[in-house]
């Protein structure tokens, strides 16, 4: 269970870094807004799911 928690936490941290860089870039480039909008929604949904998963796994690990 600890390994799954660590992978989920690493995934959350990496996705957070990607979103911190990607969201301002997506808002700054209006040419690809239609494609960027879908990626932002998917990235945000995955990020929220990972937050809940890490919270749930933290309950079982600690």
From Swiss-Prot:
Topology class, membrane: Multi-pass membrane protein
Compartmental location: Cellular thylakoid membrane
Q: Where are the transmembrane segments?
A: 8-28, 41-61
Which cellular component, as a GO term, is one annotated location? photosystem II reaction center
Mind telling me which Pfam families this protein's record contains?
Answer: Ycf9 (PF01737)
Kindly indicate whether the keyword 4Fe-4S belongs to this entry.
no
Disulfide bond residue pairs: none
Q: Which InterPro entries match?
A: PSII_PsbZ (IPR002644), PSII_PsbZ_sf (IPR036512)
Q: Name one GO biological process term.
A: photosystem II stabilization
**UniProt KW keywords:** Membrane, Photosynthesis, Photosystem II, Reaction center, Thylakoid, Transmembrane, Transmembrane helix
Purpose: May control the interaction of photosystem II (PSII) cores with the light-harvesting antenna, regulates electron flow through the 2 photosystem reaction centers. PSII is a light-driven water plastoquinone oxidoreductase, using light energy to abstract electrons from H(2)O, generating a proton gradient subsequently used for ATP formation.
For this chain, the family text in UniProt reads: Belongs to the PsbZ family.
HAMAP family given in the database record? PSII_PsbZ
Its assembly, as annotated, is:
PSII is composed of 1 copy each of membrane proteins PsbA, PsbB, PsbC, PsbD, PsbE, PsbF, PsbH, PsbI, PsbJ, PsbK, PsbL, PsbM, PsbT, PsbX, PsbY, PsbZ, Psb30/Ycf12, peripheral proteins PsbO, CyanoQ (PsbQ), PsbU, PsbV and a large number of cofactors. It forms dimeric complexes.
What's the protein here called?
A: Photosystem II reaction center protein Z
């Amino acid at each position: 269970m600890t390994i799954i928690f660590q992978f989920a936490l690493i995934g959350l941290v990496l996705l957070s870094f990607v979103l911190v860089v990607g969201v301002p870039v997506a808002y700054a480039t209006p040419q690809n807004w239609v494609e960027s909008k879908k990626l932002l929604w998917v990235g945000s949904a995955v990020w929220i799911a990972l937050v809940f998963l890490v919270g749930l796994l933290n309950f079982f690990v600690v």
